[in-house]
């Protein structure tokens, strides 16, 4: 008899991956599906980065790497943080992993004991609460609705902190909402955290360069917060390198050493060839990053304009990332005569089957009244997707 662990059985499957799989299954059957469920850029990795990887292969750069990554990559990250963020770190305060996802999970696993609480603002990326549960901690969900641009307030943070609180996960720019915390908003959160020195901040900044409101702001830029903050970042989103799997943490050396110890026992260092590519991503020209950001902003403007014209959608303007997160609960309880919509997951499935547009219901993001749409696709796909969605929703009575 097969018996899986309680740890595994406590986890929920990824809704984003599940919807992407269903979309791909329909495509394989010949259905013309427009996929707005994916969380990755639709651009190709810039040529100069690919050339660096090719050279690494030709140079037989194919051995096991040090667990935290090669010094050359970690030093490139140190320079990036200094130049772009005004933050001083040493290479010993950097640990590279197989994507930012592993970097987040490593940090949670080395910090959280059974019974510890981790504050997770909602809407959240689907994996945050599951990672906390994997560490046998308790995710404490703090909800922020569309009326506050999906960003928690200092008062909400203060109310959520208890003696059991070990960490706060803060994602800005946000997946799934595209919300971005301003310097003033981060200052308000920092003032609360100053009263609770036991709380570590895990700052997921993977969408740093897909930001439409100016220079990126990190909570680690506040002097009193730097030694209590673990920055998580990587090359996936900014450089269109999702499959290369390079992420990193920058933070207090005691946490970085712990992550190295943990990672050394289950994956070791990340891919050597990918590290060479990531090194060149950070040290080479940044023009492709700027061009992709401009394209994403144009698409953001387009999808917001079109979605605001969809009856029943409540839309805010995302300030970063490449997601729209409209409120859609006006459709709950309605039917097209064949299917009744109970929640946003039902609505997402209805849109996939009726409009052949893949979106992701908001329940897995901690916001069951919303639905996530990725605009990491062509302008033409955005226009056609919203047309189909509008037509399908009009059938619900």
Regions found by a protein language model. Give the residues of each.
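PLP-dependent class I/II
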Residues: 2-4, 8, 12-14, 19, ...
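Generic structural signal for well-ordered alpha-helical scaffold segments
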Residues: 24, 78, 82, 108-109
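A glycine-/small-polar-enriched, mobile loop at the entrance of the PLP active site in fold-type I
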Residues: 37-40, 55-73
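Glycine-rich phosphate-binding segment of PLP-dependent enzymes
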Residues: 45-64, 78, 83
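Conserved N-terminal alpha-helix of the aminotransferase class I/II PLP-enzyme fold
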Residues: 64-97
């Amino acid at each position: 008899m097969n018996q899986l662990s309680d740890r595994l059985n406590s986890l929920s499957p990824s809704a984003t991956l599940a919807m992407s799989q269903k979309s791909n299954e329909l495509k394989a059957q010949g259905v013309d599906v427009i996929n707005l469920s994916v969380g990755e850029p639709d651009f190709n990795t810039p040529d100069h980065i690919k050339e660096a990887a090719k050279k690494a292969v030709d140079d037989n750069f194919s051995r096991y790497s040090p667990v935290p990554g090669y010094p050359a990559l970690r030093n490139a990250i140190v320079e990036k943080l200094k130049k772009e963020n005004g933050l001083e770190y040493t290479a010993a305060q950097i640990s590279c992993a197989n994507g930012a996802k592993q970097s987040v999970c490593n940090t949670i696993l080395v910090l959280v004991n059974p019974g510890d609480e981790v504050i997770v603002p909602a809407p959240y990326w689907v994996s945050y609460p599951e990672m906390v549960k994997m560490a046998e901690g308790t995710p404490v969900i703090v909800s922020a609705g569309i009326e506050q641009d999906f960003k928690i307030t200092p008062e909400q943070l203060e109310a959520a902190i208890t003696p059991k609180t070990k960490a706060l996960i803060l994602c800005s720019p946000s997946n799934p909402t595209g919300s971005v915390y301003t310097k003033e908003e981060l200052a308000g959160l920092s003032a609360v955290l100053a009263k609770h020195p036991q709380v570590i901040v895990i700052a997921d900044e993977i969408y740093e360069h897909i930001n439409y409101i100016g220079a990126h702001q990190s909570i680690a830029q506040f002097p009193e917060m730097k030694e209590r903050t673990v920055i998580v970042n990587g090359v996936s989103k900014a450089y269109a390198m999702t499959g290369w799997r390079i992420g990193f943490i920058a933070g207090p050396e005691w946490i970085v050493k712990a992550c190295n110890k943990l990672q050394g026992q289950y994956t070791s260092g990340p891919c050597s060839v990918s590290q060479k590519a990531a090194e060149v991503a950070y040290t080479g020209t940044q023009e492709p990053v700027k061009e992709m950001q401009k394209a994403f902003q144009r698409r953001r403007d387009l999808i917001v304009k079109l979605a605001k014209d969809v009856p029943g959608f409540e839309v805010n303007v995302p300030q970063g990332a490449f997601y729209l997160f409209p409120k859609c609960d006006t459709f709950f309880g309605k039917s097209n005569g064949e299917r009744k919509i109970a929640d946003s997951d039902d609505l997402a499935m209805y849109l996939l089957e009726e409009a052949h547009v893949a979106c992701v219901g908001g329940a897995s993001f901690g916001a069951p009244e919303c639905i996530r749409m990725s605009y990491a696709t062509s302008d033409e796909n955005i226009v056609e997707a919203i047309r189909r969605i509008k037509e399908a929703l009009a059938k619900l009575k």
